[in-house]
C-alpha cells in the first residue's frame, strides 16, 4: 500500500447537487459579488462611515466579514450577497463568523452583524440578532442599522 492509496481512501466522495459551473461562469458570479461589495463600501463612505472591503479569495476559517465599517462608537460587519433572483439565503455559519469578528472589538459600544442583499434595483439590509439561518427577499424593507 502506498501513500497515494491512503490519501485517496480517506475522503469519501461528496455528492454534488446541481450542475457544475464552468470556470468562466464561476468567475462571473464572483465578480458580481465583488462589485456589490465595492458598491456597498462607496455607499457607506458617502454616509460618513469609514468602510473597507475585506478581499478573501476563498472561504476561510477566520471570522472575516465581506465589508466592515465604523462610525463613532459603532462597528458594523457585513455579509454581502447579490442576486438576480427574488431571495438570498444566509447560512448560520456565515452569521456566526460575523459575530465572532465583532467580538474582537471590545472598544465599540454598538456592534451589529448585518446581512446585505443586493437585488437588481434595490439593497436590503437585515441586522442579524442571533446566530441562525436567514432569508432576505426583495420585497422586504431594510432594518435600522445604527440607531437601533
Where are these regions (language model features)?
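Conserved catalytic cores of phosphodiester-cleaving nucleases, focusing on short active-site segments
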Residues: 44, 67-84
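Short active-site-proximal "capping" loops at secondary-structure junctions
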Residues: 57-61, 83-84
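A short beta-strand motif that forms the metal-chelation/ATP-contact edge
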Residues: 66-69, 125-127
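Short, charged, amphipathic alpha-helix that recurs within catalytic cores of restriction-modification
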Residues: 83-115
Amino acid at each position: 500500500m502506498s501513500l497515494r492509496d491512503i490519501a485517496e481512501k480517506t475522503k469519501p466522495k461528496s455528492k454534488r447537487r446541481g450542475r457544475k459551473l464552468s470556470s468562466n461562469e464561476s468567475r462571473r458570479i464572483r465578480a458580481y459579488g465583488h462589485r456589490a461589495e465595492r458598491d456597498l463600501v462607496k455607499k457607506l463612505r458617502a454616509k460618513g462611515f469609514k468602510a473597507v472591503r475585506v478581499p478573501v479569495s476563498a472561504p476561510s476559517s477566520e471570522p472575516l466579514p465581506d465589508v466592515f465599517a465604523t462610525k463613532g462608537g459603532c462597528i458594523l460587519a457585513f455579509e454581502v450577497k447579490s442576486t438576480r433572483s427574488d431571495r438570498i439565503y444566509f447560512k448560520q455559519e456565515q452569521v456566526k463568523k460575523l459575530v465572532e469578528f465583532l467580538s474582537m472589538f471590545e472598544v465599540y459600544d454598538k456592534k451589529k452583524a448585518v446581512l446585505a442583499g443586493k437585488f437588481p434595483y434595490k439593497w436590503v439590509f437585515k441586522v442579524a440578532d442571533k446566530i441562525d439561518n436567514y432569508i432576505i427577499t426583495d420585497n422586504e424593507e431594510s432594518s435600522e442599522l445604527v440607531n437601533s
